[in-house]
């Protein structure tokens, strides 16, 4: 089997070029200051004439801890600031936070003393704890905070966060909005914040210059936003394509790579699905083809569990995204699967015959499941695609009652995948937590091994197979076509002054 491991390592072409500059990692037992956020004329869009109009869902409310629409969540980021912002490269910058230090399972964040909150005292540690508790329980921010169990104010400008495990990259999770204590308790509340704008009478007014006004037009759903853009009522439309509905809108369209990872779950408790066969499956899957055909071009093929546009991906991974039939067959043959039994290859002990379950509510994913089944058939696999209701699909996964499943998960700003390797999560059933891809992950997050070393291990074992990252799209009117989207997918309006 050592020969198989060598083949996987060499032929997959994991050209791991590790950079000495690691912007996201915090040194152990240290406190690292975060640079002030700066905005230049070259990468910002200035509101000067009060004519910019953005969509607003009035029934959803502007409270960021209760809002569910993208329109209002993105609007709220102009009104409220996070501890750390996360840009399109998944690099973090301290906004309300001045610094962060990691010691064991504790992250200590120091708050800037001069974060002004209009009409209130400056933001302090108690406000951060209040905001964290609301974010942890919220629809949009809750999943981002997996791995952070609680927060406690140590003094007026220091917050201690308790972690599930030592995590030098945890700042990427801390992009939730900070508001003043007691101002965000209900859906109809308009919390007090420290952002560039404040909300009043269905419009946003610049804190620095009251003449800078952003008008808001009420919209009830995504279709109404798009209609409003097409007739010139609003200047921005965004869709994450979760409804699988792509329309051609009037304006300047920009495709945005989201943090939504499409992946193939593999049950390692099935005898045939050892790390070698899993690697053969990963080699044969053509991520580029799935992105282009199954997702109609609205995805980016990538075979590591890190965002393809992130700094980490640029430093670490060069993995072939096209299918490699020769490599897959080589691995399968060396595992003894050299003859057929019916329509599937066998090694005498196991048969390469599996079921692949998929949620029937997502037609992109259903198409991808059949694509994978057809592709693997070329190497002697017999894959029975089972299209299930969401309830049945979810129950099968959480109970570990599956061979393979095609899933999707939204990664947070730190690209944490610990949920796949921790007991008790719906993602971990069927994953062998004693294999190196699981155990080494926590050493990587603790800073004991480099990102280069960890993702090399992952690509040798593939506890699950990342397939692609979905994309959404933004349409900008002619009036704001120069708006910089450098903070997407986390902040649509980050480029507005």
Model regions and ranges:
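Periplasmic binding protein-like
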Residues: 54, 229, 377-424
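N-terminal lobe/hinge region of extracytoplasmic solute-binding protein
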Residues: 54-102, 133
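Aromatic- and charge-enriched surface segment that lines or borders ligand/interaction sites
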Residues: 68, 98-140
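Append "and occasionally in soluble cytosolic enzymes with long acidic Gly/Pro-rich linkers
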Residues: 274-371
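Extracellular/periplasmic solute-recognition and catalytic clefts
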Residues: 201-203, 209, 215-269
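Surface-exposed binding/hinge segments that line
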Residues: 101, 106, 141-184, 198, ...
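Gly/Pro-rich hinge or "lid" segments in bacterial periplasmic/extracellular proteins
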Residues: 162-223, 325-326, 330
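Extracytoplasmic/peripheral linker and loop segments enriched in polar/acidic and small residues
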Residues: 384-393, 418-480, 497
């Amino acid at each position: 089997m050592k020969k198989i491991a060598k083949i996987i390592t060499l032929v997959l072409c994991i050209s791991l070029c590790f950079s000495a500059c690691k912007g996201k990692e915090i040194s152990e037992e240290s406190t690292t200051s975060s640079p002030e956020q700066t905005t230049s004329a070259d990468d910002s869009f200035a509101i000067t004439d009060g004519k910019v109009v953005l969509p607003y869902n009035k029934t959803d409310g502007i409270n960021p801890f209760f809002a569910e629409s993208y329109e209002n969540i993105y609007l709220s980021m102009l009104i409220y600031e996070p501890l750390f912002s996360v840009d399109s490269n998944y690099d973090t910058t301290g906004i309300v936070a001045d610094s962060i230090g990691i010691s064991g399972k504790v992250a200590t964040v120091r708050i800037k003393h001069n974060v002004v909150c209009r009409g209130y005292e400056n933001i302090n540690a108690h406000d951060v704890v209040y905001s964290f508790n609301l974010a942890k329980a919220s629809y949009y921010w809750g999943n981002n905070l997996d791995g952070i169990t609680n927060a406690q104010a140590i003094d007026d400008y220091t917050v201690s966060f308790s972690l599930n495990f030592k995590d030098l990259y945890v700042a990427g999770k801390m992009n939730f909005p900070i508001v003043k204590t007691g101002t965000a308790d209900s859906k109809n509340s308009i919390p007090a914040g420290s952002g560039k704008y404040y909300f009043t009478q269905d419009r946003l007014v610049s804190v620095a210059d009251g003449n800078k006004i952003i008008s808001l037009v009420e919209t009830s759903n995504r279709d109404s936003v798009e209609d409003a853009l097409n007739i010139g009522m609003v200047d921005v439309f965004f869709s994450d394509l979760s409804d699988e509905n792509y329309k051609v809108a009037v304006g300047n369209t920009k495709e945005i790579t989201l943090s939504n990872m499409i992946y193939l779950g593999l049950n390692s408790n099935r005898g045939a699905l050892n790390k070698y066969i899993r690697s053969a499956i990963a080699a044969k899957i053509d991520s580029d083809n799935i992105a282009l055909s199954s997702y109609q071009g609205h995805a980016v093929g990538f075979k590591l569990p890190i965002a393809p546009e992130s700094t980490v991906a640029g430093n670490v991974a060069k993995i072939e995204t096209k299918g490699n039939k020769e490599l897959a067959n080589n691995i399968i043959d060396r595992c003894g699967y050299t003859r057929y039994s019916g329509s599937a290859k066998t090694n005498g002990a196991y048969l390469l015959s599996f079921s692949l379950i998929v949620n029937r509510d997502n037609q992109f994913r259903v198409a991808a499941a059949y694509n994978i089944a057809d592709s693997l058939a070329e190497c002697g696999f017999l894959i029975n695609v089972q299209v299930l209701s969401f309830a049945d699909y979810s129950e099968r996964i959480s109970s570990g009652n599956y061979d393979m499943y095609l899933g999707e998960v939204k990664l947070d700003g730190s690209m944490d995948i610990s949920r796949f390797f921790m007991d008790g999560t719906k993602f971990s059933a069927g994953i062998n937590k004693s294999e190196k891809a699981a155990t080494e992950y926590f050493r990587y997050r603790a800073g004991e091994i480099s990102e280069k070393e960890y993702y090399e291990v992952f690509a040798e074992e593939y506890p699950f197979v990342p397939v692609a990252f979905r994309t959404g799209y933004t349409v900008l009117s002619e009036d704001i076509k120069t708006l910089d989207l450098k903070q997407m997918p986390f902040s649509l309006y980050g480029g507005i002054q």
